[in-house]
């Protein structure tokens, strides 16, 4: 397995090291190449994503990312657009995969729920994040700004197809979340994609939920969801809520996936770089380790992925409230494998 590693900034470096321990234990032929991308690199050289390094990254089987950003040295927005979004578009990471599972011992406002275990499949390369828009008369009382949301049949259909295939392996239930009663043009594409692809999956039950209602149900009745498919903007919102109800984004893993397999997919914890605690050895690497499990599953190593998730669940259940270091968590999980 050839793995491109981007530790990034802050605690990204620390949690990535623990995820690599886990991968090294399970993958004897693991080959890693580290790429120094992020706030430190940009602050020192002005480089965000050099073309030659992106070409090198393309040659790997997958990418493991830590966390990017440090507002103390790089203004917000520069790295998000110039590095993260740029990489997403360049590598056609059209599926953003966000599992949401409430593990034993996780602190959640919904801890009394019998079970929370669903997955959000978010479209990753369209919607209002394509940079299609602009502003005129800036700074005047007549300023006008537009952000155009791009929705294509090609983009929606391939993400919906991925979601149906995933639902087939789980509880065979798929929910489309959108706002079709107001966003009728984009909504029509997504609805037609569900109907068209759904005809190929007759045993997968489908449902529809408006985005505003979905935020209520995710808090009051999360067990109604198994696989959720949605567009880029709604997915951005709903996945953070999913993280909150399952113990916080500190436990949330994610995958940015090119479902065609043409480009390597990237896996990362959802949390940020937290420069205020970097170097203190107190960052929780659980999300990075669960992201490594997603990476293993994506590359066809289902048994290894399931082992990691089971060990993480057992570790969380016995962790308690006392302080525990980043490396200790990584060592315990690695040893238990």
UniProtKB/Swiss-Prot annotation:
GO molecular function, one term: NAD binding
Keyword annotations of the record: Amino-acid biosynthesis, Branched-chain amino acid biosynthesis, Cytoplasm, Leucine biosynthesis, Magnesium, Manganese, Metal-binding, NAD, Oxidoreductase
Domain of life: Bacteria
The keyword Glycosyltransferase appears for this protein: no
InterPro entries: ICDH/IPMDH, IsoCit/isopropylmalate_DH_CS, IsoPropMal-DH-like_dom, LeuB_actb
Enzyme class: oxidoreductase
Pathway terms, separated by semicolons: Amino-acid biosynthesis; L-leucine biosynthesis; L-leucine from 3-methyl-2-oxobutanoate: step 3/4
EC numbers for this chain: 1.1.1.85
Co-factor binding comment: Binds 1 Mg(2+) or Mn(2+) ion per subunit.
Subcellular location: Cytoplasm
GO biological process: L-leucine biosynthetic process
Catalytic activity, as annotated: (2R,3S)-3-isopropylmalate + NAD(+) = 4-methyl-2-oxopentanoate + CO2 + NADH
Annotated Mg(2+) binding sites: 212, 236, 240
Keyword match Secreted: no
Cofactor: Mg(2+); Mn(2+)
GO cellular component terms given for this protein: cytoplasm
Residues where substrate binds: 88, 98, 122, 212
Site feature: Important for catalysis: 129, 179
Positions that bind NAD(+): 272-284
PANTHER family noted in UniProt: D-MALATE DEHYDROGENASE [DECARBOXYLATING]
Family: Belongs to the isocitrate and isopropylmalate dehydrogenases family. LeuB type 2 subfamily.
NCBIfam families: PRK03437.1
Function: Catalyzes the oxidation of 3-carboxy-2-hydroxy-4-methylpentanoate (3-isopropylmalate) to 3-carboxy-4-methyl-2-oxopentanoate. The product decarboxylates to 4-methyl-2 oxopentanoate.
Subunit structure: Homodimer.
Protein's name in the database: 3-isopropylmalate dehydrogenase
């Amino acid at each position: 397995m050839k793995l491109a590693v981007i530790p990034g900034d802050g605690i990204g470096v620390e949690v990535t090291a623990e995820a690599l321990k886990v991968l090294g234990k399970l993958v004897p032929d693991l080959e890693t190449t580290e790429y120094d991308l992020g706030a430190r690199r940009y602050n020192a050289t002005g480089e965000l994503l050099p073309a030659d390094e992106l070409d090198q990254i393309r040659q790997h089987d997958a990418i493991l990312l830590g966390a990017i950003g440090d507002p103390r040295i790089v203004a917000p927005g520069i790295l998000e657009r110039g590095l993260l979004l740029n990489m997403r578009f360049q590598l056609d990471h059209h599926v953003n995969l966000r599992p949401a599972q409430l593990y034993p011992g996780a602190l959640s406002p919904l801890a009394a729920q019998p079970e929370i275990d669903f997955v959000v499949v978010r479209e990753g390369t369209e919607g209002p994040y394509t940079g299609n828009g602009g502003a005129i008369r800036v700074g005047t009382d007549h300023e006008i700004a537009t952000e155009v949301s791009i929705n294509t049949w090609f983009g929606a259909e391939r993400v919906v197809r991925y979601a149906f295939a995933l639902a087939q392996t789980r509880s065979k239930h798929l929910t489309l979340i959108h706002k079709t009663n107001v966003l009728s043009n984009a909504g029509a594409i997504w609805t037609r994609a569900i109907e068209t692809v759904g005809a190929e999956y007759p045993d997968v039950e489908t449902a529809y939920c408006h985005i505003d209602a979905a935020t209520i149900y995710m808090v009051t009745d999360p067990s109604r969801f198994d696989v959720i498919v949605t567009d880029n903007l709604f997915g951005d919102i709903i996945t953070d809520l999913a993280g909150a109800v399952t113990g916080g984004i500190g436990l949330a893993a994610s995958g940015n996936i090119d479902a065609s397999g043409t480009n390597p997919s990237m896996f990362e914890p959802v949390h940020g770089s937290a420069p205020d605690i970097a170097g203190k050895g107190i960052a929780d690497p659980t999300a990075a380790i669960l992201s490594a499990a997603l990476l293993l599953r994506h590359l066809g190593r289902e048994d290894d992925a399931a082992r990691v998730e089971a060990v993480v669940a057992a570790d969380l259940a016995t962790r308690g409230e006392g302080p525990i270091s980043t490396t200790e968590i990584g060592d315990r999980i690695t040893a238990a494998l």
